[in-house]
Amino acid sequence: MVYILLAPGFEEAEALVPVDMLRRANIETATVSIIGEPVPGSHGVTVLADVTLDDVDLS
């Protein structure tokens, strides 16, 4: 599993292009909100992440 962390002010292209490419390659990928709610990007695009940081099990 690949986790892409999203924080307020993230650069949309830098986060979402890799997510798109990984998913096209059938690599399990999830976006993670570090604030527990939809995350506003640097260019005004708000992204609803797949999970919140509290939901991620790294063990």
Segments (PLM) and residue ranges:
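Extended, subdomain-level signal for the structured scaffold at the beginning of enzyme domains
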Residues: M1-S59
